[in-house]
Amino acid sequence: MAGSNIKVQIEKQLSERILLIDGGMGTMIQGYKFEEEDYRGERFNKWHCDLKGNNDLLVLSQPQIIRDIHEAYLEAGADILETNTFNATTIAMADYDMESLSEEINFEAAKLAREVADKWTEKTPNKPRYVAGVLGPTNRTCSISPDVNDPGFRNVSFDELVEAYSESTRALIRGGSDLILIETIFDTLNAKACSFAVESVFEELDITLPVMISGTITDASGRTLSGQTTEAFYNALRHVKPISFGLNCALGPDELREYVSDLSRISECYVSAHPNAGLPNAFGEYDLSPEDMAEHVAEWASSGFLNLIGGCCGTTPEHIRQMALVVEGVKPRQLPELPVACRLSGLEPLTIEKDSLFINVGERTNVTGSARFKRLIKEELYDEALSVAQEQVENGAQIIDINMDEGMLDAEACMVRFLNLCASEPEISKVPVMVDSSKWEVIEAGLKCIQGKGIVNSISLKEGKEKFVHQAKLIRRYGAAVIVMAFDEVGQADTRERKIEICTNAYNILVDEVGFPPEDIIFDPNIFAVATGIDEHNNYAVDFIEAVGDIKRTLPHAMISGGVSNVSFSFRGNNYVREAIHAVFLYHCFKNGMDMGIVNAGQLEIYDNVPEDLREAVEDVVLNRRDDSTERLLDIATEYLERAVGKVEDKSALEWRDWPVEKRLEHSLVKGITEFIVEDTEEARINAEKPIEVIEGPLMDGMNVVGDLFGEGKMFLPQVVKSARVMKQAVAHLEPFINASKEVGATNGKILLATVKGDVHDIGKNIVGVVLQCNNYEIIDLGVMVSCETILKVAKEENVDIIGLSGLITPSLDEMVHVAKEMERQGFDLPLLIGGATTSKAHTAVKIEQNYSQPVVYVNNASRAVGVCTSLLSDELKPSFVEKLDIDYERVREQHSRKQPRTKPVTLEVARANKVAIDWASYTPPVPLKPGVHIFDNFDVSTLRNYIDWTPFFMTWSLVGKYPKILDHEEVGEEAKRLFKDANDLLDRVEKEGLLKARGMCALFPASSVGDDIEVYTDESRTKVAKVLHNLRQQTEKPKGFNYCLSDYIAPKESGKNDWIGGFAVTGGIGERELADEYKANGDDYNAIMIQAVADRLAEAFAEYLHEKVRKEIWGYSPNETLSNDDLIREKYQGIRPAPGYPACPEHTEKGALWELMNVEESIGMSLTSSYAMWPGASVSGMYFSHPDSRYFAIAQIQQDQAESYADRKGWNMLEAEKWLGPNLN
């Protein structure tokens, strides 16, 4: 049957049901207990070496046995037979000196399976059976040295593998295979050689069969034998465009589940799995029964992971029969629609999407650009050369560029040697490789050494179209992305126009003629040196920057790269100025859309850190703003060559320093003083018999005082956090001594805390962790955006006593339900704590607690956490605590079930009929003074401080009261003053040292309302819709008011009035996460939380400032507005700025529309998680409405008819609608 027809037929089957692959062939053969003579048969009875164990040979010596096994699997329900050719390549057959029989074995195996499959298809024509020609991994590995003393050695080459696989593929096709199955991949480079061979044979024979790919995760590390993660492995072979991608062997279904789940999420094609029947026992046997295995398969299928299922080692026809029973009628996994992205990999994946931040390509492993690296390669000091690569990765390079083009080097041999050595260093090989050479043979040699998906640097049209197309096709077959230089037969592009012309021509050839994915095309439009003294060179940087923007606009999904250090070449020897030039140049390139650059990752300067006078001079040069810009830069360049800054701090002794060491430690803990904690802790250690006694004695005594004072309300949360910082520093000093003496101190329990997947907010979680640590609980904090799999895996590994989940956005509630279900499925017996801004006792009782049989406790604030944990971990207190909890939850559920809305629900039709009544005929919407997009980069923090609303800041620290009155509060006033001072001191540092960056943008677009939605137009002609913003409407009875919807405040399309809508996104948190992590690493939880709280306030202040500027200057409908900060906080202005995820527009995915409309991530670097949380966490976004009647409102509960209408307008099915509208669905 023709390959294309087979593909269509199989894809139809896969879309309708879960197909079954057969089970273990080796397992069935072992059941016959064959001896040497059985393997030999008559034909090979005089073979010169032992043949026992050569299972593939049985297709020649015992074909009836193989036929019977195939028959048994088809009778059990299998749809796809695998040929008995797992070890039938010439390379594997060499173990038996049978290389010459490889072709025959593959042919006969396919022919035999074909006959059996055709027989069963004839019996049941409505269920066709297919033959998958199997190409196994061979017994050699192309990525790993078999010699521990020589990590660069290989016992098989890429070309040898291609030759062996090509012979097998031809025979499998000739024998009648419907598909080619590349399976049990433990080394992805072997599989890349195999796929290269398969595609070459397809081209040679002018036939294309569907290809199935199946890898092997070898152990609990979640990686292949050669070290790749599931996603990295997928990215490396995605170019094959297989019909299915899957996992098999090594693990049983329990261990393999997590990785099949990952694959089902990332794979654009169908997903297969054929696990082992559990893990082998002490005798090498597999114990998982068909019924038990089918139970796992049923759960996988119902979870939506599967399109094909089968078995590997230890499985039998009975296993397949039971699987067939449990998947019958279960809907197969639906293919996901994934965003267009360049998906690269080393040992780990690197996905570059439209909204990704700038990608740094390390440049120092290049003999033409690094004298040190060239010397090391020339002297064959490869170990030291590897350290150069590792330094680049450690300094932030996400890709490393490797170039060996030097006249006195054998570039091809050096490239192969170095890449093979890199493969043995996980800290280097975790990132993708850019194979860089001007010689095609060197590029090909490099591509044959990298198992991940790398990048070729580079090809061009310099030698004509024919050669360009030939090389591009091979690069695609090797599975790499490509950099295309702006170079053709005329020469290098040095003007903006030539750059566009060449890149456009190359793009059209690659996409339209070669079939190269546009997202894997990276253009290098040539970076040339500026400030050379030659006038013709002055505009080189401007030409590049402008060409970047043109290419990004006109060549969809293509990316831009370049060798950044070229631009500053005329200042070689003055690294300070060169780094300033790089910083300025990159800043402008990135703003225009540049995706990546080849840079020295260890010497990247930050744009804002360049001194203002130098930055201005550099910008004059880069942007060609003045005729004398080169001379002005030269004048001040020398001044910066050896600039240095020093700082001395004085310490002063205090009276309490004369106290006994135990009291000094207590004083430091209570007062939060870190200055002397290490020396006092050391003194206490010397006085103690064992170092652990210092923790269990004076330090815990001091923390008990802190806990008592906090419990009595005499200390407040900020002070407790400072105390924890002191404690951490003391413990950090003692840890080496404790470890050396193998002592273990007692704690009250071990608690795992995590912000769930898709959510980036963790201030509350961090505070809870600190409070619990102060009460002698060991805390394992996994941070933010933590997957369910990671939470539960670490919980098991660390043997924790309690798991605590946190989240701020509403989609996190569903993720918490998922975690609870998984804990129940996996048999956890730990209490589960639930907390975060969107959580509630009602949601916990109704949605979470009923999915998990162990205690699930809603913790509404940090002060309650200690009491809850104490009760849950106490044998005496737990029974009564849980009993009261159960009674309370039952009461909450009853209240929820009886709860009636304050007003009755109405139909959507009725609600729409009661929309806000606005007389549009007598109202003219204001036209913006400055329409379009406005970007505020590195905005002045001092301006934002004037717009801070401090009341929520104190609430973060559990100090309740309104600012400024809280500063004079009888109980908390003194602590509020200290906290306020610390925050402002930190803000002073933020301003002075640039610790945080604030970035923001707003945009004003022509718009009209169409029913409940808002059409946003590309321009003032209003002929093309750029985006539709979808809205919900209040859906309860409103006898004296309206059923509000945000679209009511935009002029209807039919009114003929030209209205406008605004959008904005701001962050005050660029750098906040890194700072917080740095403070945490130094044991300073107080400042870690403080920087987060301050960043949050700056983000909200930025939103307030920008809205005012829009009203007064940009939109300009309130030019004479004069409001105090208090007036602004009280919203006494005209217009509103509702935010997706909040009451007036509670559905979070509308942020995605806003991001696309304004190009937020490209413009200012803010991104969205899978749950539509904003990153950085200290961010605000929303829409601007100008109508004087516009007001805030809450949607509350909606009915089924509105959910269906909303789903239809969004293009969702109802499952998707229920997921995102859940909190509002009645």
From Swiss-Prot:
<dbReference type="GO" id="GO:0050667">
    <property type="term" value="P:homocysteine metabolic process"/>
</dbReference>
<keyword id="KW-0170">Cobalt</keyword>
<dbReference type="InterPro" id="IPR000489">
    <property type="entry name" value="Pterin-binding_dom"/>
</dbReference>
<feature type="domain" description="Hcy-binding">
    <location>
        <begin position="7"/>
        <end position="327"/>
    </location>
</feature>
<feature type="binding site">
    <location>
        <position position="313"/>
    </location>
    <ligand>
        <name>Zn(2+)</name>
    </ligand>
</feature>
<keyword id="KW-0862">Zinc</keyword>
<keyword id="KW-0846">Cobalamin</keyword>
<feature type="binding site">
    <location>
        <position position="249"/>
    </location>
    <ligand>
        <name>Zn(2+)</name>
    </ligand>
</feature>
<feature type="binding site">
    <location>
        <position position="806"/>
    </location>
    <ligand>
        <name>methylcob(III)alamin</name>
    </ligand>
</feature>
<dbReference type="InterPro" id="IPR036724">
    <property type="entry name" value="Cobalamin-bd_sf"/>
</dbReference>
<feature type="binding site">
    <location>
        <position position="862"/>
    </location>
    <ligand>
        <name>methylcob(III)alamin</name>
    </ligand>
</feature>
<protein>
    <recommendedName>
        <fullName>Methionine synthase</fullName>
        <ecNumber>2.1.1.13</ecNumber>
    </recommendedName>
</protein>
<feature type="domain" description="B12-binding">
    <location>
        <begin position="748"/>
        <end position="883"/>
    </location>
</feature>
<keyword id="KW-0479">Metal-binding</keyword>
<feature type="binding site">
    <location>
        <position position="949"/>
    </location>
    <ligand>
        <name>S-adenosyl-L-methionine</name>
    </ligand>
</feature>
<dbReference type="InterPro" id="IPR003759">
    <property type="entry name" value="Cbl-bd_cap"/>
</dbReference>
<dbReference type="GO" id="GO:0032259">
    <property type="term" value="P:methylation"/>
</dbReference>
<keyword id="KW-0028">Amino-acid biosynthesis</keyword>
<keyword id="KW-0486">Methionine biosynthesis</keyword>
<dbReference type="InterPro" id="IPR003726">
    <property type="entry name" value="HCY_dom"/>
</dbReference>
<comment type="pathway">
    <text>Amino-acid biosynthesis; L-methionine biosynthesis via de novo pathway; L-methionine from L-homocysteine (MetH route): step 1/1.</text>
</comment>
<feature type="binding site" description="axial binding residue">
    <location>
        <position position="761"/>
    </location>
    <ligand>
        <name>methylcob(III)alamin</name>
    </ligand>
</feature>
<dbReference type="InterPro" id="IPR050554">
    <property type="entry name" value="Met_Synthase/Corrinoid"/>
</dbReference>
<dbReference type="InterPro" id="IPR033706">
    <property type="entry name" value="Met_synthase_B12-bd"/>
</dbReference>
<feature type="binding site">
    <location>
        <position position="696"/>
    </location>
    <ligand>
        <name>methylcob(III)alamin</name>
    </ligand>
</feature>
<comment type="function">
    <text>Catalyzes the transfer of a methyl group from methyl-cobalamin to homocysteine, yielding enzyme-bound cob(I)alamin and methionine. Subsequently, remethylates the cofactor using methyltetrahydrofolate.</text>
</comment>
<dbReference type="InterPro" id="IPR006158">
    <property type="entry name" value="Cobalamin-bd"/>
</dbReference>
<feature type="binding site">
    <location>
        <begin position="1192"/>
        <end position="1193"/>
    </location>
    <ligand>
        <name>S-adenosyl-L-methionine</name>
    </ligand>
</feature>
<keyword id="KW-0677">Repeat</keyword>
<dbReference type="Pfam" id="PF02965">
    <property type="entry name" value="Met_synt_B12"/>
</dbReference>
<feature type="binding site">
    <location>
        <position position="312"/>
    </location>
    <ligand>
        <name>Zn(2+)</name>
    </ligand>
</feature>
<keyword id="KW-0949">S-adenosyl-L-methionine</keyword>
<keyword id="KW-0489">Methyltransferase</keyword>
<dbReference type="GO" id="GO:0008705">
    <property type="term" value="F:methionine synthase activity"/>
</dbReference>
<dbReference type="GO" id="GO:0008270">
    <property type="term" value="F:zinc ion binding"/>
</dbReference>
<keyword id="KW-0808">Transferase</keyword>
<dbReference type="GO" id="GO:0031419">
    <property type="term" value="F:cobalamin binding"/>
</dbReference>
<dbReference type="Pfam" id="PF02574">
    <property type="entry name" value="S-methyl_trans"/>
</dbReference>
<dbReference type="GO" id="GO:0005829">
    <property type="term" value="C:cytosol"/>
</dbReference>
<dbReference type="InterPro" id="IPR011005">
    <property type="entry name" value="Dihydropteroate_synth-like_sf"/>
</dbReference>
<feature type="binding site">
    <location>
        <position position="1137"/>
    </location>
    <ligand>
        <name>S-adenosyl-L-methionine</name>
    </ligand>
</feature>
<feature type="binding site">
    <location>
        <begin position="758"/>
        <end position="762"/>
    </location>
    <ligand>
        <name>methylcob(III)alamin</name>
    </ligand>
</feature>
